[in-house]
Amino acid sequence: MAKSNEIKAVLTSPIISNNPITLQILGICSALAVTSKLENAVVMTVAVLFVTAFSNFFISTIRNYIPNSVRIIVQMAIIASLVIVVDQFLRAYAFSISKQLSVYVGLIITNCIVMGRAEAFAMKNKPIASFMDGVGNGLGYGVILILVGAFRELFGSGSLYGFVILPLTSNGGWYQSNGLLLLAPSAFFIVGGIIWAVRTMRPDQVEPKE
């Protein structure tokens, strides 16, 4: 029972109480760049979740055989291999989304969340716990991406996942789209607003004053 509770805590903690974006301020670049559409945000979420979970699992499995002097190189090799798998899969089965995500799929290799969990958790814990930690951090990252992507697409173009929700005036509807929300700077303010909201509701996440 205790072990089950530990696994549950590892899985759920990164989603709210220890979210990699709202608390640790990691993975911000892709959160700004790929959230102009909900579809892109969902695909990036799945990609990061897959890479984080399986890189944690594989690194944890061989952690006792990795020389300390080359551990970062080994971690990056495993992460890069998984990113290549994701990139080739998207090119084969979702080419249009792959083109929209552009270099940001490849840049998962350098995502602070992926590297951070490999070094801080997978190198010190067993494979199953490490896998669940990767899933949890991928979900925590994805929750923010999906919130930002949904907000930007809905109020920026009046649609969600390509389906019209707010009919645009240009098409005879009533909603005047806000083009600013489709630009990357808007994501910066939305993410900032989410961080503010989370820390207002959870004062324990506010950094102490110096």
Swiss-Prot record:
Compartmental location: Cell inner membrane
InterPro entries attached to this UniProt entry: NqrD, NqrDE/RnfAE
Reactions catalysed: a ubiquinone + n Na(+)(in) + NADH + H(+) = a ubiquinol + n Na(+)(out) + NAD(+)
Top-level EC class: translocase
Alphabetized Pfam families for the sequence: Rnf-Nqr
Keywords, in A-Z order: Cell inner membrane, Cell membrane, Ion transport, Membrane, NAD, Sodium, Sodium transport, Translocase, Transmembrane, Transmembrane helix, Transport, Ubiquinone
A GO biological-process term: sodium ion transport
Primary site of residence: membrane
Transmembrane segments: 42-62, 66-86, 103-123, 131-151, 154-174, 178-198
GO molecular function, one term: oxidoreductase activity, acting on NAD(P)H, quinone or similar compound as acceptor
Membrane disposition: Multi-pass membrane protein
EC number: 7.2.1.1
An annotated GO cellular component: plasma membrane
Family: Belongs to the NqrDE/RnfAE family.
Assembly and binders: Composed of six subunits; NqrA, NqrB, NqrC, NqrD, NqrE and NqrF.
Physiological role: NQR complex catalyzes the reduction of ubiquinone-1 to ubiquinol by two successive reactions, coupled with the transport of Na(+) ions from the cytoplasm to the periplasm. NqrA to NqrE are probably involved in the second step, the conversion of ubisemiquinone to ubiquinol.
Record protein name field: Na(+)-translocating NADH-quinone reductase subunit D
Organism: Psychromonas ingrahamii (strain DSM 17664 / CCUG 51855 / 37)
GN (gene name): nqrD
